[in-house]
């Protein structure tokens, strides 16, 4: 029985099982995952986030801010701690149960007292402890993998939102120029029509082009606002104004990346 008890023991790891997630994140994403388990650690992370936000964000910086700051990811980290606690609890000895009964009765002028004390153990839980620990270890390992996967998912969504936001804002700037040109064209068409050099059809065509350009710009502005708000949420920031982005997307590479072993890797 002692062997069963010893084999079922489990204890908390110094890092709460987070090192596996951190190493996987560094290897697959190239980012630093940190779990703020104290106020001091949270302050250090906040300082790092402030430094990253002090300049226009690059794509990798945006991913790093999201990993540091995303509230959903913080919840996943705490789920990892809960999973480890369940694993450790499965390896703890079940508490014994102590009960005492005290009775008395009087008979023939004599009072008799009766005291019963019972100490019980959950023998079934004790015997099945090693199996329970093994199950919780597997659950803990699965939680580690799921947490690392959640980090990768957040990084992917952040990259998409980052480039989508820059593209949306670049489209707004382009469509503003289009609207300005269309507005100038509509104004010129109106003046030309007034002096008889444009007929009504030509004027209506220019006016329609201006109205279409204005509508396209309004839609682009709404899409830009929505894209920036989504990026703000992924980064865990309180306001879209906290983000500074480059004015344009990076140039495409002149040559495609060479991936000779991509088929074998796939």
Annotated model-derived regions:
Residues 68-75, 81-96, 107-109, 117-135, ...:
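A glycine-/polar-enriched beta->alpha junction
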Residues 59-71, 98-102:
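Glycine-/proline-rich flexible loop or hinge segments
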Residues 129, 145-265:
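Periplasmic alpha-helical coiled-coil/stalk elements that build and connect Gram-negative outer-membrane
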Residues 44-55, 99-128, 132, 245-259:
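Small/polar, glycine/serine/threonine/aspartate-rich low-complexity segments that form flexible
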Residues 93, 101-105, 122, 185, ...:
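Outer-membrane beta-barrel pore domains and translocons
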């Amino acid at each position: 029985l002692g062997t069963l008890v010893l084999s079922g023991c489990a204890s908390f790891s110094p890092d709460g099982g987070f090192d596996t997630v951190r190493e996987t994140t560094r290897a697959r994403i190239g980012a630093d995952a940190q779990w703020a388990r104290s106020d001091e650690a949270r302050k250090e992370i906040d300082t790092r986030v402030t430094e990253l936000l002090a300049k226009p964000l690059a794509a990798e910086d945006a991913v790093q801010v999201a990993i540091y700051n995303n509230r959903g990811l913080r919840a996943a980290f705490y789920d990892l701690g809960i999973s480890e606690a369940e694993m450790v609890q499965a390896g703890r000895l079940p508490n014994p149960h102590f009960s005492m009964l005290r009775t008395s009765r009087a008979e023939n002028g004599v009072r008799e007292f009766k005291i019963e004390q019972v100490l019980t153990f959950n023998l079934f839980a004790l015997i099945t402890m090693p199996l329970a620990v093994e199950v919780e270890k597997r659950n803990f390992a699965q939680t580690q993998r799921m947490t690392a996967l959640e980090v990768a998912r957040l990084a992917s969504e952040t990259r998409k939102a980052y480039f989508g936001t820059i593209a949306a804002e670049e489209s707004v700037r382009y469509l503003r120029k289009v609207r300005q040109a269309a507005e100038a064209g509509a104004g010129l068409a109106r003046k030309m029509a007034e002096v008889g050099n444009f007929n009504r059809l030509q004027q209506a065509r220019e006016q329609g082009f201006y109205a279409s350009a204005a509508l396209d710009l309004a839609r682009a502005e709404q899409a830009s606002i929505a894209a920036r708000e989504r990026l703000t949420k992924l980064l865990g920031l309180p306001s879209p104004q906290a983000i500074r982005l480059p004015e344009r997307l990076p140039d495409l590479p002149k040559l495609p990346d060479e991936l000779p072993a991509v088929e074998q890797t796939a």
